[in-house]
Amino acid sequence: MARSTSGVHQGHQARKRFGQNFLVDDGVIHAIVAAIDPQPDDVLVEIGPGLGALTVPLMERVPTLQVVELDRDLVARLQRRFGDKLIVHAGDALAFDFGTLHVPGRSLRIVGNLPYNISSPLLFHLSAFADRVRDQHFMLQKEVVDRMVAAPGSKAFSRLSVMLQVRYYMELVLEVPPGSFNPPPKVDSAVVRMIPWPADKSPYAPVDMRALGTVVTLAFSQRRKVLRNTLGSLREVIDFDALGFDLGRRAEEVPVADFVAVANALPAERIAGGAPDLNED
């Protein structure tokens, strides 16, 4: 039977302002849950449960499930449907303190079909809690996942690649076509697995994320130009030759570790405030 594409699912009209596209493909749902492999002792958190496509099979694996949902209509619906077994945090995931859900001795795991219109800022927000999280599994626009896992030298390698790869090991788990959703998005989707690097096993030196954000924002500000042009303003405060950093390269050719080295050499007064804009590369 053909799936509905009207945007109305289980009596709920998908809201464009919340970026709602409801997952309706049972095969994809089961594949995602299998990839997550929830364990009874996990502290499992779902962002944007929507109408419960992932929520139901996840709740079959854990005693309680915590969810973060912005849509008030869906919050009420979820509470009526699942009762005390579901702990609902009503509010914006972009402002939620995920660190408060960490329980010593238990694995904090975060999953979700993320709204594509806020995916990059939400990923950056979540990175602040990486030291308390075991792993994350997210459905995202495939183009975003491609950027997240891209290697230096590829066209997809970007600011987002650098800022997330320094915090996580990441891999593409599953590709998902538009027809798996109601309403179908205009783009292909994919599931990504994100595992925070343990402090003692990270391939990268510790780095101030604001300093790294400052460097990569400058570096990728004009992708077609070599770094001698985009990072030229830093030559007065950083000895690039001493770092062995070749300014004749383009930003997309530079390994993450090289960006980290530059960020660690950046004087505090040159660090830009706030989080970098990761939406455009």
UniProtKB/Swiss-Prot annotation:
<keyword id="KW-0694">RNA-binding</keyword>
<keyword id="KW-0963">Cytoplasm</keyword>
<dbReference type="GO" id="GO:0003723">
    <property type="term" value="F:RNA binding"/>
</dbReference>
<dbReference type="GO" id="GO:0052908">
    <property type="term" value="F:16S rRNA (adenine(1518)-N(6)/adenine(1519)-N(6))-dimethyltransferase activity"/>
</dbReference>
<feature type="binding site">
    <location>
        <position position="48"/>
    </location>
    <ligand>
        <name>S-adenosyl-L-methionine</name>
    </ligand>
</feature>
<keyword id="KW-0489">Methyltransferase</keyword>
<dbReference type="Pfam" id="PF00398">
    <property type="entry name" value="RrnaAD"/>
</dbReference>
<dbReference type="InterPro" id="IPR020598">
    <property type="entry name" value="rRNA_Ade_methylase_Trfase_N"/>
</dbReference>
<comment type="function">
    <text>Specifically dimethylates two adjacent adenosines (A1518 and A1519) in the loop of a conserved hairpin near the 3'-end of 16S rRNA in the 30S particle. May play a critical role in biogenesis of 30S subunits.</text>
</comment>
<protein>
    <recommendedName>
        <fullName>Ribosomal RNA small subunit methyltransferase A</fullName>
        <ecNumber>2.1.1.182</ecNumber>
    </recommendedName>
</protein>
<dbReference type="InterPro" id="IPR001737">
    <property type="entry name" value="KsgA/Erm"/>
</dbReference>
<feature type="binding site">
    <location>
        <position position="92"/>
    </location>
    <ligand>
        <name>S-adenosyl-L-methionine</name>
    </ligand>
</feature>
<keyword id="KW-0949">S-adenosyl-L-methionine</keyword>
<feature type="binding site">
    <location>
        <position position="69"/>
    </location>
    <ligand>
        <name>S-adenosyl-L-methionine</name>
    </ligand>
</feature>
<keyword id="KW-0698">rRNA processing</keyword>
<keyword id="KW-0808">Transferase</keyword>
<dbReference type="InterPro" id="IPR029063">
    <property type="entry name" value="SAM-dependent_MTases_sf"/>
</dbReference>
<dbReference type="InterPro" id="IPR020596">
    <property type="entry name" value="rRNA_Ade_Mease_Trfase_CS"/>
</dbReference>
<feature type="binding site">
    <location>
        <position position="23"/>
    </location>
    <ligand>
        <name>S-adenosyl-L-methionine</name>
    </ligand>
</feature>
<comment type="similarity">
    <text>Belongs to the class I-like SAM-binding methyltransferase superfamily. rRNA adenine N(6)-methyltransferase family. RsmA subfamily.</text>
</comment>
<dbReference type="GO" id="GO:0005829">
    <property type="term" value="C:cytosol"/>
</dbReference>
<feature type="binding site">
    <location>
        <position position="21"/>
    </location>
    <ligand>
        <name>S-adenosyl-L-methionine</name>
    </ligand>
</feature>
<feature type="binding site">
    <location>
        <position position="113"/>
    </location>
    <ligand>
        <name>S-adenosyl-L-methionine</name>
    </ligand>
</feature>
<dbReference type="InterPro" id="IPR011530">
    <property type="entry name" value="rRNA_adenine_dimethylase"/>
</dbReference>
<dbReference type="InterPro" id="IPR023165">
    <property type="entry name" value="rRNA_Ade_diMease-like_C"/>
</dbReference>
